[in-house]
Swiss-Prot record:
Bilayer topology: Peripheral membrane protein
Name used for this protein in its record: Autophagy-related protein 11
Cellular compartments per GO CC: Atg1/ULK1 kinase complex; phagophore assembly site membrane; vacuolar membrane
GO biological process, one term: autophagosome assembly
Compartments in which it is found: Preautophagosomal structure membrane; Vacuole membrane
Residues in coiled coil: 582-730
Subunit structure: Homodimer.
GO molecular function: molecular adaptor activity; protein kinase binding
Length: 1046
């Protein structure tokens, strides 16, 4: 594991931390402050990749184990503009001095000694220069690394703000997509307004005006948040641009601050050392040798060759070291400017973060609360269903509770009666004892278990009906399934009392637990007795202790008394006494010995006891230390888990952000492809337009060429006439000239007519130049024939001038007027005024045609849309909107005839209601058709005359004609058949397909609008389908349609 280094961002100096251990974060900061001369409060520590090192994340051993290599130390003062920063060099370089031998004319020992001293000093300077170059190179690299780390820190800080901003934007977008403010109106009207519970609608639970106020506040707050987030987005984009510019500035600093540390320096230093060694060797030989001629020549060679080289190398090293120091100072100044820009950018990011964490967060919280209030509208059907299910469950529980209460109340009453009888019997026999003792004989006469008040009664059928209402309104499968599952759970609700078997089983478990606890206590007691040696039994392990005790209890007197009890001979007794005395002495020695041993053992025992007490104290201290360490360890583990969770969350956010970037990239690619395709289409359109323009230009060019040819031919003719002109004018030549002038005038007159036919007029501007202008209404007075040329020329002043000129020169013989006329015509046609005007007019007409084509297309779409909204009354096709009316069903009985069945499908019967003829007003087809086709929003009955609407007084309970009444004379039931109203071709019948959904939907309605989805054609034959008994060869259609009854 490499050692960790502290790197100063101000000077680029590094310091190793391999053998230094800092138990606290404050010790590390104090060490950095003392090492780099930075105030303790101004120290900022950053890890690689821009992570800030804080007190909570400091653990020296852990960081060393994880392989931390660098810690970057920043001075907060360099981020302040008010504090002037000036880099201070650590040392001063001195320029190498020239060799003393260079200026000396004679070679002696003093010069050689001074030269050797100069050589040693120069060698030391060169080595110092080499070290300065290397250290400066490393310092510059570290300074650039510090700049990179600081930009990474700014990037991380900005990333946190961007994540916070994106989270708010995503939340707001989700509210826009799924918020209740966009759905509650339709839900309130279509769902809550159609669900009826307890004789009221669910919509009556809310105050509509309050909901509207909440919606207005949500929209107002949403607009404010959008405006604020847009402003913050601009600030974030500006910060991103600033960060990009800072990265570019740092790259420029890296490019412009290249400090080379190549091998040339090492080679020069090695060469310098070789030459210095040679000079030193020759100098020593010159001092020692008697004959100095050879050494003098060699020394002269060194003086003229090697000494200048040494001076050149030292000067080069000095210059390079000076340049590197200047480069380092420049890098420090540029990085200080960079750090100031970083501080400004961070301040703007902090302002954005402050707004996001305060204002935006508060508004988001309020917006969320308001959305929750509106979401109650969407959740009310489900919550009301859960409310009904809970009432149903409580009702089931109450019923079961009542049953159990009745059962146990009767059982307890029997027990109470038995106890009362037992006490009465006892008091009857031993009543006299109550005079001495206080005996409580009071018992309640009956057992009373309080009942629970009845809840609101809810039946299962009511819940199912409510669920069916929700299903009919297409509320959603998850809600329906949830309510059904809750109903199933409520039906499983039960109430059980604990039995005697359960109580006895619990008691047995408690007893088993007590037994296990007693066994554990016995084991602990046995262990305690095992450690007390005095309580051991007398056996092998306790034998020595028992013998010592016996020895201590026996005394000399007792032994003498025992010896005196025997009656022995005197000699033997003397011998025995001597022996006893010896034994006594031995025993005294043993006693003294054992007493000393006992004292030693007691001393050792006291020492051991004191050591034991000390060890107990140390053990308690260690235990307390271990407790504190465990607490710190648990805290560190929690912090590590929090750190890992935070890193995982950041990783997930980064993945999400990366996924969103990929999606945006794909979207941009698709937009690029779409733009490229549109560009290709535009290029094709441009090419088509260019082709059309080229075609028109070719046509105009051809016309101009033809006119030019005519003019040229006329010029040639005139020239020929002028050449062949003689003094006497021939009559035929004059006639031919007049014919040419007439032709030229006709060409001019045709050109004027062409211009007039496309709305152009030849005229002059204020300067007298020819011009062709657009005149509105010019084409109204023209006809397609050439007879109106004079009328078109009458509106052109120039045309009138040329006409008058042409008329005036018809009978003139002089050549000059004719030449002026030709020149005037040539000037008129020579500048291509006619061609450019015609081409420009054609382009205007083409653009106008495109505009009209677009307007016609829009009109076509409007006509198609209006055609789709119109009611079709003949030639029906799928997709047409048709009027459906019920057919009089009297002829649908089994005994009806063919003629009556045919009459039931007439145009008048098709407009009859579902009631019978005797039970409803005779509504005429023209009345209903006029009501529908006129677009009236009122019902059909409102458009029927009163004389027709009041013919039938028989109505059912709903106020509608009773369609399914049973005729008292005939018990056969009547069926409703719906058909399409047709204005023409009543021979073809269009009948609605007999499906339960359609007829349930159209129940109790007099008319309906439907869009045809399918037509099935039938022709009545012998084997064909004929449920209505149409005549043979009758064509009828079975129709499927969609109805929108709202």
């Amino acid at each position: 594991m490499p050692p960790c280094k502290l790197i100063c961002a101000t000077s680029g100096v590094s310091h190793q931390l391999s053998n230094v251990y800092f138990p606290s974060f404050l010790d590390l900061k104090q060490f950095a402050s003392d090492t780099f001369q930075i105030p303790l409060d101004d120290i900022l520590l950053l890890l690689p990749y821009g992570m800030i090192l804080k007190k909570a994340g400091w653990d020296s051993r852990k960081l060393q184990q994880e392989g931390l290599e660098e810690i970057y130390v920043f001075d907060r003062g360099i981020f302040n503009e008010e504090i002037e920063f000036s880099p201070k060099p650590r040392f001063q370089l001195f320029k190498p001095l020239p060799s003393p031998i260079s200026d000396s004319l004679q070679l002696d020992k003093n010069v050689i000694l001074r030269n050797l001293g100069w050589l040693k000093a120069l060698q030391s300077d060169v080595e110092f220069f080499q070290d300065v170059i290397k250290e400066t190179y490393q310092d510059v690299q570290r300074l650039l690394e510090c700049g990179t780390v600081m930009l990474e820190y700014l990037k991380n800080y900005c990333y946190e703000v961007e994540v916070l901003y994106n989270g708010n934007v995503d939340f707001l977008n989700k509210l826009h997509e799924d918020g209740a403010s966009n759905q509650w109106h339709s839900f309130y009207d279509n769902i809550l307004g159609n669900i009826k519970v307890s004789n009221q609608l669910l919509s009556s639970f809310f105050n509509y005006s309050e909901l509207t106020e909440i919606e207005d506040s949500i929209h107002r707050l949403d607009r404010e948040l959008n405006a604020k987030l847009k402003e913050l987005k601009k600030s974030i984009d500006e910060c991103y641009q600033q960060r990009t510019q800072l990265i570019s500035d740092l790259d420029d600093v890296k490019k412009n601050s290249v400090v080379s540390s190549d091998d040339m320096d090492n080679q020069m230093v090695e060469r310098f050392k070789e030459m210095a060694t040679e000079i030193e060797l020759v100098s020593n030989q010159y001092k020692e040798e008697a004959s100095k001629d050879a050494s003098k020549e060699k020394f002269e060679t060194f003086k003229s060759v090697h000494v200048p080289k040494l001076q050149t190398i030292s000067q080069a090293m000095f210059n390079k070291a000076s340049t590197n120091l200047d480069t380092k100072a420049t890098v420090q100044q540029k990085l200080q400017q960079l750090y100031l820009s970083v501080a400004k950018s961070q301040m703007s990011v902090i302002m954005v973060k402050s707004v996001l964490t305060k204002d935006v967060k508060t508004n988001m919280k309020f917006l969320k609360n308001e959305e929750l209030k509106l979401s109650q509208v969407l959740d009310l059907p489900m919550c009301y269903g859960l409310y009904l299910i809970e009432l149903y469950r409580e009702q089931l529980w109450t019923d079961r509770y009542s049953q159990l209460r009745q059962q146990h109340e009767s059982s307890l009453q029997h027990l109470l009666d038995d106890e009362v009888r037992q006490r009465n019997s006892w008091y009857k026999d031993f009543q006299w004892i109550t005079r001495f003792l206080d005996v409580d004989s009071l018992l309640p006469s009956s057992v009373y278990i309080p009942s629970i008040s009845d809840h609101k009664q809810v039946t299962l059928s009511q819940i199912k009906d409510y669920i069916n209402q929700l299903a009919s309104l297409n509320l959603g499968e998850p809600t329906i399934n949830l309510l059904k599952s809750k109903v199933s759970q409520a039906e499983l609700t039960g109430l059980h009392l604990p039995t005697d078997y359960a109580l006895s089983k619990d008691s047995e478990l408690i007893i088993e637990g007590y037994k296990a606890r007693i066994k554990k206590l016995e084991h602990l007691l046995l262990d305690a007795q095992f450690h007390q040696y005095d309580s051991w039994p007398a056996g092998i392990l306790n034998k020595e202790t028992a013998m010592v005790q016996m020895f201590r209890n026996s005394t000399v007197s007792t032994k003498l008394q025992q010896s005196s009890t025997f009656d022995l001979p005197s000699s033997k007794q003397q011998h025995e006494s001597n022996k006893t005395f010896e034994e006594f002495q031995n025993l005294q020695k043993d006693i003294s010995k054992y007493s000393e041993l006992t004292k030693t053992l007691e001393t050792e025992l006291s020492t051991l006891k004191s050591q034991l007490s000390h060890m107990e104290v140390e053990k308690n201290a260690y235990r307390e230390s271990m407790t504190n360490l465990n607490k710190e360890l648990s805290t560190l583990l929690i912090e590590r888990e929090n750190f890992y969770s935070e890193m995982n969350s950041r990783s997930e956010n980064f993945k999400k952000h990366l996924g969103s970037l990929f999606e945006q990239n794909e979207e941009l690619v698709r937009e690029s492809e779409e733009s490229r395709r549109k560009s290709e289409d535009l290029n094709k359109m441009k090419e088509d337009l260019l082709v059309n323009m080229a075609t028109q230009e070719v046509q105009a060019e051809q016309e101009r060429a033809s006119l030019q040819e005519e003019v040229e031919s006329l010029k040639k003719d005139l020239n020929q006439l002028q050449i062949s002109k003689s003094k006497t004018i021939d009559a035929e030549f004059i006639n031919f000239n007049k014919q040419l002038e007439k032709t030229l005038y006709d060409v001019f007159q045709g050109s004027i007519f062409i211009l007039a036919s496309i709305g152009l007029l030849l005229s002059k501007d204020q300067d007298g130049n020819f011009q062709i202008v657009r005149v509105k209404g010019l084409r109204k007075d023209l006809d397609s024939s050439l007879a109106d040329m004079n009328s078109s020329m009458a509106k052109s002043v120039i045309a009138q001038e040329i006409k008058s000129t042409f008329e005036s020169i018809k009978d003139q013989i002089d050549y000059k007027p004719h030449e002026n006329f030709i020149t005037y015509i040539e000037k008129l046609f020579g500048n291509q005024l006619f061609e450019t005007s015609v081409i420009r007019r054609f382009n205007d007409i083409e653009s106008l045609a495109k505009k009209l084509r677009k307007e016609n297309k829009n009109k076509k779409l409007l006509l198609q849309k209006s055609a789709r909204d119109k009611i079709t009354i003949y030639n029906f096709q799928p997709g047409d909107l048709a009027l459906f009316l019920p057919i009089n069903d009297q002829e649908l009985l089994l005994n009806s005839s063919i003629s009556s069945l045919n009459s039931s499908f007439s145009s008048i019967d098709l407009n009859s209601s579902t009631q019978s003829v005797m039970q409803r007003p005779n509504v005429v087809k023209s009345d209903i058709a006029a009501s529908i086709l006129n677009g009236s929003s009122a019902s059909i009955t409102e458009n029927i005359p009163l004389s027709k609407a009041n013919r039938n007084p028989a109505l059912n309970a709903n106020g509608r004609p009773d369609t399914f009444n049973v005729n008292t004379q005939d018990s056969a039931k009547k069926h409703v058949v719906w058909a399409i109203f047709t204005a023409t071709n009543t021979d073809i019948k269009y009948v609605l397909r007999n499906s339960t959904s359609n007829y349930e939907l159209l129940k109790d309605r007099e008319w309906a609008m439907g869009r045809i989805s399918a037509l099935e054609k039938h022709v009545v034959g012998d084997d064909s389908k004929n449920p209505f008994k149409f005549p043979r060869n009758t064509v009828w259609y079975e129709v499927d349609a969609f109805f929108n009854l709202d």
